[in-house]
Amino acid sequence: MAKLTARFDLEDKVSKKLKRIHKGFQEVEKKVKTINRQIKISIRAEDQAFYRLRKINDYIILKFAKSLEIKVVLDDQVTSKLDAIERKLKRLPKETKLTVSLVDRTAAAYKKIKKMLSNQKLSFLLIPDDKVTSTVKRIIGYIKKNLKNGYTVKLKVIDEITKTVNRLTALLRKFEKTYYVKVVVKTKISDKINKKESLINKETSKKESDKSSDKGSDKNSDQKPGWVGKIKGWLKDWWTKSAWPWIKDTLNEIGKAFLDRFKERLIEKLKNDVFDKIIDKILGPQKKDDSGENSDTDKKVLNRNTGGNCCCDCCEGGISPGTKNKKTYRKKKSPTKAPNRTLKVPGEVIRRRQSGTPAESAPRTSGSKLKNWLGGLKSLGKDSSKLGKAFRGMGKAVPYVGSALAVFDLAGINKDNAGEKVGSIGGRIAGAEAGATAGAEAGATIGSFVGPEGTAIGGAIGGIGGGLVGGIGGEEAGKNIGKMFDTSKLKESISNSLFNKEWWSGKWNSISDTANGAITWIEDTWSKVSTWFDQYVFTPIYNVAVPVINFIVGLFAYAWDGILAVWNIVYPWFKDNVWDPISGAVTNVATTIWTGLCNAWTVISGIWSTVSTWFMDNVWNPVSEAVTTAATWIWSKINDAWTIISNIWTGVSNWFYDNVWNPIVKKVEDIKTSIKEKFDDARKFFEDAWDGIETWFNEHVKDPLVKVSEKIAEKFQWLFDLKDSVGGFVAKVIHRGEEVTHLKKKPIKKDSKEKKTSSKPTTNNIFAQSPSNNNMTVFQQALDQNATGGYITKPTISWIGEAGKEFVIPVDNNRGRGKMLLSQAASKLGMQVVDDMGAASSSGGSPASVSGGAAVSPLSGTASPVMNTANLTGQASTLGQQFSEGFGKGISDQPVKMEDWKKKNINTPFTQMISASPNYGKQMVSGYAKGQSGTATGTDGFLQSKVKTPFQATVSKSSSWGTGTVKGFAQGQNSTQTGTAQYVSTHVDKPFLRSKDTSNSWGSGLIGNFVTGMNSKSSEVKQAAKDMAKRVEQAFREELDIHSPSRVMMSLGRFASVGVVKGLDSVDVKKYAEKQAGSLAAAYSGMGAVGGNVKQWLMAAIMATKTPLSWLSGLMTIAQYESGGNPNSINLWDSNAKAGNPSQGLMQTVPTTFNAHKAPGMGNIRNPIHNAAAAIGYIKSRYGSIDNVPGIKSLKRGGPYVGYANGGLITKEQIARVGEGNKREWIIPEERGIRGRYLLQRAAQALGMEVTDPSQSQQSELSSGQVSAVTSASRPTAAVSGSKEIYIQFNGDQHFHNGQDAESLAAKIKQALIDELQKDINIGTKGVVAFD
């Protein structure tokens, strides 16, 4: 931040007076601020009457509210409960469900194994599950019992039946019960027949196999069929003639009997063990394994949680005749099935819970399932008595006793009457069981009308009677069936009918017709059942529920009428004695308060009118007039002074250009011309001297070595012949092996980059090549074909280290180790890796020393691609040692051509020295620039930020400063110790003249020492190379101090930095030097461009642009994809070509991009080095690094190559990809609007450029004369008597960084002028103002 100080002469009385005037102004400002302060007047009128009235009002309201408190509370807890009851009662009909389920077990049996249907039995169950009637009766009694007390109507209504309603709500769950009518078809013996069929099939197959193996087939055909064949025949005839017609007739009769006799319920129950005994008697005992598997499976299917043999939702919920009071909850989804389950709670359980009896001591009832089902409907009495238990136990035991006694009828059984005996026993057992069950349930139903005891007795009597009757009827039916089995030919026809596939196909039609008839019968039956249910179940329940609802609603209607009557009596008294007195008192108090407020406001408004009038007349108007007058006077004086200053500045500007600016410009132009001439002379001297060196080298070094190599080749020609013969023999052996194994070498895919290379050896592979492929063994040739190195971009299995040492360097991950390995690899190859090429050039380009172990044979030598100038003696010694060792080893081990060795060890190093020589000029310019930048102020930055920018701002405002500023400036210039001309001569002319004189000896010393050193040691090649390198190194070190050019160049540029305006392009010394050095570099680098290869071109461009060596692989990839390595390639088909701006050259750059980023002195787009240098500049400015180029980044990710992101002009609507690689791009609209100009300015700043508007006049830039005029301090001189002078002096310590600093300076100058003029007007004194 610039520092501006003001030094006043303490002995100057005028300055002291100015200070006093300044203090006076400050006091005036304070007084003005005091006058401008706001004046607040607070008027408070205290009305004691108002306060007292308010207290009286508060007291009346407080005391009156406490003295009389009347509350009317109506607490109605009944209405909501009754509404809930009413809603639930309305839902009762909607939730009634009628379910009809037909479970046909017969059809499933037919589909699986087509079993016999001889003893197929079907049972139908009609179950009306009425749980509502008893609940409704119980609710009616409960309501009648608990509503006798009614409602008590008071001023505060108290609901005495809240708990009663809550209990009623809990009881409403009974209304949610569901009615079910289930029709179940059960199959009882399908599994038994299935098991027997498998057994019979096994026996039949065994018999047939025995018959087929018998030789006497005719004799076997005459034999009678076995027992199994007879059974098949008997069963077939019996089924056709007797069984099936009897089953159809019996089913029809049973269905009619069920409908006529048992409308409410009929349960058929046959024990599985009874049927097991019957079928075992008929078909014989079964194996435990077979019966266990099938019977268990069938039982699991029939006895699941679905409720026995029924598949309807009710059975799934647990309401089935086979379950006893299972508790399932309605509307709660089970984990498996049963979405509609119903909670069933018997009446005994409810009564036990209400009475508080524990479950352990509660009486248990036993009996038939029908009795338990009807037990839920009973609402009065208890169902436990000793007599009932006795009868029920007896009735339950009778069927089983009858079943046991029936076994004694098996006495006298023989072959002829076995069917009759077994049939009578089975019929007796089944009939007794079924009759006992049905009779017990029917008797219990009839007895329930008498009471609980009647229910138990009726169930017992019904069970006994039903068992006897059923046993008698079952015995007769079984006897007839068994006799029919014995007398008919059923046994003979079983094998031919029941186990015959054709027989089954004929019978199936009859079975399906019968099943359809059964379904029709079920539909007719259900029609009658539903009519009966509506008549005898739903209508009675509905008729009972409606009066209950009406009764409850009527009770609450009477209660509400009572509440209304009481309120009609209370309301008149409340209005007369409470409401009217309170409202009147409140109205009077409010009227009094408002009247007092109105009177107070009238008094306040009158007082304020008087105060405001006085304030305006005595305070505001005098202050405002005084301030206005003072401001007008001050402004008029400032304008007068400003007019005088502006008239004087015109003369100042003319003097400044004539005496400061123009002399400096002329002197700098002369210096520029002189420097250019010296650089041209030096370049011409180098070119002329090199021609002599080349001639001498060919005469004294190249030609003798060629002759020596030819002689050596002649001496060792026999080795070549031996190698050819041995190699031919080895080749024949390998060829013979290929004929046997049929294995041949796969062709090696050469890198596309190598195809484009010239036949001229490259810098990096000269020392790695063999003298001739023909001089190598077969194994060495194979190794040489594989050991080519390369760049790995994806996972690969590779053969490494097969021909020597190799480095594997990671570049994406573990970059620290990669850099370390890269440095080691460069050291082994005689190269150096640097991150900053500028730092490398400043250090003289000292290379890494060549280790002795790096090249132990002439086949693996190393060389640097850059000319090493700091350690040539050591390198020359190493090269000589390698030559001697390699020469001896080549003679003793294998033949080596002298021509190849000469190219590798002599021609190539000196060629590299030629290509590296352009760096010398660059290093000199770089050191010169570094010397300038190393000054205390910094020439470029100092002149740009401290001189150019502030003076431009000063020029635009200098017309207002006045004559005093101009005269003080001129006097300060003239009073310096050195003066402008002397300063320029000392700090500009003499340093450059010294540089001119010194530069003449650089080339002569270099070439002279070089030639002398070569001539003195021409007799010995090894010593000559050493001395030559040493002379070259010494010349450069002594004359240029090239190992540290910054030291020499710093001394040259230190004194020339101050006063030289480097910011101007016309006199920019650094740019001029770079341009001259660049042209010199271009001249040298262009020597081998056409004859080189891609790698050499890119290496030269990398060195010219000071780019890291790590960019080489990426640049080679871009060159290969963009041009194929062809520097003359041009693209004539893309959008750039259509716009007249085709991409061309090695890196395929468009001319506009090339011109924007080309290196100094490299302006030929077809020159591959120039093209690559421009491409490198573009990559640096656009992407920052080679790794961020879209094509390189895409290839590293395993994707395709992507071309440049070049930007361009958009002339039509399109969809484009911008910002590739997350790099910034600017999109600027072409219209001349605020947005477009703003974006253009921002883009120029990002590119390090400036944007100017030609429509606006631009002030001319200041020359270096302005700089020298202000960089020297001066002392103020005494003013001439009778004159008035104001000195404003500047020196190099005054730094202006931005416009704000300049504006601050101008403001301070104007203030000083105003103060001085004001003082002169007031007191008439004369003084000097010194401002630094």
Curated annotation (Swiss-Prot):
Polar residues: compositionally biased ranges: 355-368
Entries under Pfam families matching the protein: SLT
Transmembrane region(s): none
Record's compositionally biased regions (Basic and acidic residues): 202-222
CDD domains referenced in this protein's UniProt entry, alphabetically: LT_TF-like
Basic residues bias locations: 324-335
InterPro entries named in the record: Lysozyme-like_dom_sf, Transglycosylase_SLT_dom_1
Disordered: annotated segments: 202-225, 324-368, 744-771
PANTHER family (alphabetical): CHANNEL_COLICIN DOMAIN-CONTAINING PROTEIN, MOTILE SPERM PROTEIN
Family, per entry: To B.subtilis YqbO.
Protein's recorded name: Phage-like element PBSX protein XkdO
Organism name: Bacillus subtilis (strain 168)
Gene name for this UniProt entry: xkdO
